[in-house]
Amino acid sequence: MKIKITAEEGQYNAHDAYMHFERQKWAELRDNVELTLSEDDLRQLQGINESLSIQEVIDIYLPLSRLLNLYVKTQQRRHTVRDKFLNSKNENVPYIIGIAGSVAVGKSTTARILQAILSHWPEHPRVALVTTDGFLRPNRELVARNIMHKKGFPESFDTKALIDFVAAIKSGKELISAPIYSHLTYDILPDKKLHLEKPDIVILEGLNVLQSASNYPDHPQRTFVSDFVDFSIFVDAETQLLKKWYVQRFLKFRKGAFTDPKAYFHSYSQMEETQAIDISEKIWDEINGVNLEENIRPTRDRANLILTKATDHQVDSVHLRK
C-alpha cells in the first residue's frame, strides 16, 4: 500500500521552506523498498562512535534512497529528452549528492550507507564516494601559511582544485582522480589517488560542500562546490551533542588509531584519560566549535534535506525542502 503524505501533514511552519517529518512518518515513505544490507554490512559501515542499527537504515535511509532514486531517474529522463531534441546520443553526466555537517555528526557513515544502498538500484549501479578532506592543503603548506590551527576552515582547502574536480565530473570526463587524505598521518597521501571512472552518482562528503557566495559576500571567488551539487543533505544535531560525540570519538581514537607509532596524534595515546578529555574539549572549543558556528551551520538552510539526530546518534526528524 502506498503512503501519501500531503504538504499540510509535512510542513511544520507555514513560513518555513521545509516540510517536517517525525521519524515514524518518514519511515512510512519507504514504500516496500527492500533492505539489501546484512548485519555484517552494517558493521563495516559504522562510524567510530555510532551504533548503527538495521532499524535506522530501514526507517531513515531506505526512504531517502527511494527519494534519491526518483531524483536521479528524473535527471536521466531529462537527458533522454535532450538527446531526442539534439537527435544525437550524449553521455549522461553523474548526479552529485552533497553531504555536509559538523565534525563528529556522522557524515561519513551517512555517505557510506547511501553509497551501499544506492549502488543496489539497477538504474545507477556505479556510485562513487569522495570526501573533501582530500582537498585540504598539505600540512607543510598550512604551516607555511600559519593556518595549521585553522585546519577544516575554508582557507585550509585548495578550493580551486576541489572546484576543478567537481567541474570535471559535471563535464562528463570519463576518468577523474582525487587526492586521498589520511586521518592516521593527518595529511594528504602524496603518492595515492582515488580514481573515478564514469560513475552514475558521486557522493561528495565534507564540511564545505554547501558553502556558497551568500556565505562569503566579500569573497572574490564566485564559483563554489555547491553550484555543482544536484541534491544536498545536511546532517545536524545540537551543539552540546556534537561536542560530546567529538570527545567520545577522540577517546576511542586514543585507545585505537592513536596507538599506531605512525599516527600524527600518537602522543595523545600516552595521556591520562582526564588530560585527553581536557585536550579534546579545548580542540572543540577553539577549532571545531568555532568552525561549526562560523562556516558550517550557516549553510544548513541551503540543503535540500536535513537529517536531525538525537542523543543516541539516531535520526529523529527529517526536513525536506518544499
Curated annotation (Swiss-Prot):
Gene3D superfamilies, A to Z: P-loop containing nucleotide triphosphate hydrolases (3.40.50.300)
Entry EC number(s): 2.7.1.33
Reaction it catalyzes: (R)-pantothenate + ATP = (R)-4'-phosphopantothenate + ADP + H(+)
InterPro entries documented for this protein: P-loop_NTPase, PanK, PRK/URK
Origin species: Psychromonas ingrahamii (strain DSM 17664 / CCUG 51855 / 37)
Main location class: cytoplasm
Keywords: ATP-binding, Coenzyme A biosynthesis, Cytoplasm, Kinase, Nucleotide-binding, Transferase
An example Gene Ontology CC term for this record: cytoplasm
Keyword Kinase belongs to the record: yes
Gene: coaA
Compartment(s): Cytoplasm
Annotated GO biological process: coenzyme A biosynthetic process
Family classification: Belongs to the prokaryotic pantothenate kinase family.
One example GO MF annotation: pantothenate kinase activity
Top-level division of the source organism's lineage: Bacteria
Residues the record lists as binding ATP: 101-108
Protein name: Pantothenate kinase
Classification via SUPFAM superfamilies: P-loop containing nucleoside triphosphate hydrolases (SSF52540)
